Amino acid sequence: MDSAARPVSFPKSRWYAKSSKPKAPYKLPESVKPPQSEQPSSTPKPEYSAEQTEFDTKADPAGNAAPEASEATESKPQQPLPDLTQGIPSTLAAELEGRTKKSGQTSLNLTEDPSRFEDYTDDGRGDIPKDGYVSSLDRRRARMANLMYAFFLLAGAGGVAYLGRNWETEEEAKAHPDIPSGWSFSSWYNRMKARLSDITSYYKDPAFPKLLPDEDPNLRQPYTLVLSLEDLLVHSEWSREHGWRIAKRPGVDYFLRYLNQYYELVLFTSVPSMMADQVLRKLDPYRIIRWPLFREATRYKDGEYIKDLSYLNRDLSKVILIDTKEEHARLQPENAIILDKWLGDPKDKNLVALIPFLEYIAGMGVEDVRPVLKSFEGTSIPVEFAKRERIMREKFEKELEEERKRRPKRGVGSLASALGLKSTRTLDGEQSPSEGLAQGKMLWDQIRERGQKNYEMIEKEIRENGEKWLAEMAAEEEKARQEQMKMMKGSFTSMFGAGKQ
C-alpha cells in the first residue's frame, strides 16, 4: 500500500532552442582546386559599368559562389502558398515572363522603320506558328468550307457548260433562229447566253407577250396613242407643309376626250400599279383611257424601264408614243414624241397644242406615222405643223382661185372632182366635203369641225349621265369585290373540311 501511494518521479531534462547562426561556406581542399592561370598584369578597361558587381569576378570557383546571407533578417520573406480551395492559380504571367526572357527584349522602334516591323509584331505567338492556335474543330470547319466552295464551283461550271448544249426541241430552235445547233465554241457560247437570258427574262421582260388583247380592227380606232403619266398628264411634288401633292395638267380632260374619237388611248407608265392606279382613278373617272399599263408591262434593261411597243399587239405603223424621257422609247424612237417635262405651270398649253397635229394624222388616214414623225425631228411639232399648215392653206387657196377662174360656170361638183373629191351625202345632215371645198374649207378643216361636234356630244353625255356612270361602275366594283370575298371564304373553309358537301 505504501508503494502505491509513493509519487512517481521522472528524470528532469531541459530543451533549448538551436542557434540559427549561419554556417560557413564550404571550401574545396587545396588538392582538388584547379590550377590557376596567370592573369595579365594589365587588363583593358571594361565597357560595362563598374557598379555591376556580377562582372567583378575571378577565375576561382570558390570566389564565384553566390554569397549567402549573413543574417536571417536579410533573407527575403517567404511568399504565402496559394489557396487551392479557390482553384488552381493562373500561370499566364509566368509563361509570358518566360517567353519574354526567351525571346529577349527589343528596343522601341522610335524611327518607325518599316523594315523592322517584324521585330515588334509577333501577335503574341513567339516561335509558335499561327495554325498552332487553331483548334481541331476550326480546322475541320475550314476543310468543310473549302470542300463546299470547290463543290459549288464545279457545280456552277458544269451547269454553265450544260446550258450550252444543242437545242432539244423545235420550239427552242424556232425561238432562236439565228443561233444554230453545233459544237463550235461560238455556237455553244451563244446557246448558253440565250438560255441564261431566257431564265432572267421573267424578271426583265413584260408580264405578258401581248399587253393588249386581240380585237377586230373594224370595232376600234385604227390608230393607237400611248401616253405617259408622270410629268406629262400629272406632276407630283412633296413639301414639308403639305406632303405629297399631285397636280393635273391644264387641258388634260379636253386632250383625252377630244382624241378619244380618233385614237385608241393607252396609258403606259413606269410607275408601279399600286401607286399609279389610284392616280388614274382621279385623273380619268369616266374611263376615257381604254387600257392602263404599269411598270409590270415595261422592260428592264441597263438600269432603265423601257416601254417596248412591240409587246402592244398593235401595228407599229399606227402607234404613237408621247413621253418625257428618251430612255423610255429607246427601242422604238421612230414612234415617239418626246416633250419637255411639265413641272406644274398652270398656264401650260403644250399638250393641247399637239391636238391639231395628231388630229391631222388620224383624220387624213396616214399609212405609216413613222416617216411623218421623222420629218418633225428636232423641231417643235406644234410650231412646225402650224407653219406647214399655213403653206398648204396658201397653196390650196391659190389653186382654188385658179380653178374658179378657168371654170366660172361649173358647179360645185365639178370643182370638187377637179380637186380629186367626189360628191357624197352625209346621213347626219352634215356638210359634204365638196360643199366645204366650194366654201374655201380645206379637207382637214372639215374634219376638225366634225371633231368639235363629236367632242361637244361627249361633253353633253358626261354632264347628263356622268353621275349615273360613276354609280354603275362603283356598283360593279362592289359586286366583284363581294364575289371575290365569297370565293376566298369558301376556299378557306374548304381547307378545314367545313365547306358544303
Curated annotation (Swiss-Prot):
Coiled coil: none annotated. Residues 1-125, 423-442 are annotated as: Disordered. Residues 165-501 are mitochondrial intermembrane. Residues 1-16 form a transit peptide. It is found in: Mitochondrion inner membrane. GO terms for biological process: protein import into mitochondrial matrix. Belongs to the TIM50 family. This is Mitochondrial import inner membrane translocase subunit tim50. It comes from Aspergillus fumigatus (strain ATCC MYA-4609 / CBS 101355 / FGSC A1100 / Af293).
